[in-house]
Amino acid sequence: MAIEPKFRPSAALRVTFLLFLVLAHTSYGGDASIQVGSVALSPDGKFIAVDVKKGNMSFIYKVAADSGIATRLTNATTGKETSPAFSPDGMRIAYVYWPGKGARSRIVMVDVDGLNPRQWSLSAVTDSSPVFSPDNKTVVFSRAELYGNDSPIAQPHAHAWKFYACDLDGSNIREITAESFYMVSSPSISPDGRSMVVVTEGLETNRQIAIYSLVEPGPPILTLQPHVPKEADHKNPIMTYPNFVPDGSVVFMAASNGKHGYDYDIYRVTVSTGTLEKLTNGNGYATDLRVSADGRTAAFLKWRKNWSGDLVSSQVYLLDLQSRETKPLNISGLR
């Protein structure tokens, strides 16, 4: 994922946010060689896809939401599989695959049983964060054409992000956004398939929630910069992981000042009015929010820190968006 750098006075926040993306993994059973990263929910909320890091590799597993039992999606033995996304009919999963050092990440699509893998991406670009349109005819994804950094204290990374759409076989690629971005989040497509929501940040613009038309590509048709209570930074709020839900509102994560550092809680914003609704309270450090297509369930990672404040493990949580109840999902079968 990208947010997916020239440093401004907020350079510390930018570095923190990049670390936020790099460190988003979960350890299980005390075995640091097994870590869980990004999550995705099937359309009916019955399955979760996660990427599981093993040493220098990572592979995608499907997890039953009722039992927590995990099974491998593919038979890959090298590289890194990340950022899974279910098709709206639940029959396919798209994900990002990085072959290894010296290569760029590309998008792969497989049947939900792991068969019939199909990959497409140019070797000179970095593709990331695929999502399906509700009519199951289009994939929207982000692409970075540059790799490097503008500061000696930052690790090299992909930037100059743009968003594209294509047919399911990777053909008919067309650009959606009229500009490139320093950082971007994963996209989420509206229920009617006519627009997408992302969090963007430019070289000269602060972080914002932006809604783009998928019918008439160009500048954003609407931008929002919600201010949550006790927000971490009023000028440049820390927010990410926007998700459209069926009623047209957007569910996202934002950072506020908590008792023991930042709380990355989940909020809902009404697009037409900007009205905010808080859905969780005191998450601590949390990442990778994803909402099911029916808008009933969200999945995310909640982190635990050690005595020195380092991230050491996290837990997959499920949030009922109606009752606002959260519960942990204990995953087995990752070895």
State what each model feature region is.
Residues V15-A24:
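Bacterial N-terminal signal peptides
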